[in-house]
Curated annotation (Swiss-Prot):
InterPro entries: IGPD_sf (IPR038494), ImidazoleglycerolP_deHydtase (IPR000807), ImidazoleglycerP_deHydtase_CS (IPR020565), Ribosomal_Su5_D2-typ_SF (IPR020568). One of its GO terms (biological process) is L-histidine biosynthetic process. Belongs to the imidazoleglycerol-phosphate dehydratase family. It is an enzyme of class 4 (lyase). This is Imidazoleglycerol-phosphate dehydratase. One of its GO terms (cellular component) is cytoplasm. It comes from Pyrobaculum aerophilum (strain ATCC 51768 / DSM 7523 / JCM 9630 / CIP 104966 / NBRC 100827 / IM2).
Length: 186
């Protein structure tokens, strides 16, 4: 059953599963590309469909609501978080850029994004929204996410960040004992 978020500004439906086909449709081309990248590298299939109901031309509401919906769908996919490795990390170079991402799917939300990005828009996506996207995703997925990016091309930094985060999620979602000294995750 998909997670649906409907506001006066957007309508977003997300259904995630492990593996399988993936279909992503948003009104922001670069967001669509980054979501396809993130979810494919994470080994996730399903559907993400976002519609902008109130055209504000800044992308903020669409990006934020998509992050909320994807985060909640990921949290639902994890159920009780048992049987997963829990931790994951990846380093991804993309030409002159390099990005390190690390995640903990243990049920505690936190985020750190260190990526100097200019205040530009690529394919309808204002890059100033990237840290907000990561923060919102972390909060709604109940995950800790760290992203450190270096490089000169903002497109490369953001794309490598989505690849690295996807690979880190793939590792964290892989079968494992979900180490915890408390005996529970979350």
């Amino acid at each position: 059953m998909p997670y649906v978020r409907k506001t006066l500004e957007t309508e977003v439906a997300v259904e995630l599963r492990r593996g399988g086909d993936l279909a992503v449709e948003t009104p922001i081309p670069f967001l669509t590309h980054m979501l396809e990248t993130l979810l494919k590298y994470a080994g996730l299939g399903g559907v993400v469909k976002a519609v902008e109901l109130r055209k504000l031309d800044d992308g903020h509401h669409v990006i934020e609501d998509v992050a909320i919906a994807v985060g909640r769908a990921l949290d639902a996919l994890l159920e009780d978080r048992r049987g997963i490795a829990r931790f994951g990390h990846a380093v991804v170079p993309m030409d002159e850029s390099i990005v390190m991402a690390a995640v903990d799917l243990g049920g505690r939300a936190y985020w750190v994004v260190r990526a100097k990005l200019p205040d530009v828009t690529i394919g309808g996506y204002p890059l100033r929204m990237f840290p907000h996207f990561v923060r919102t995703l972390a909060v709604e997925a109940k995950a800790t996410i760290h992203i450190y990016a270096r490089g000169t091309d903002p497109h490369h930094k953001v794309e490598a960040a989505h690849k690295a985060l996807g690979l880190a999620l793939r590792q964290a979602l892989s079968p494992g004992e979900g180490l915890s000294t408390k005996g529970v995750l979350g």
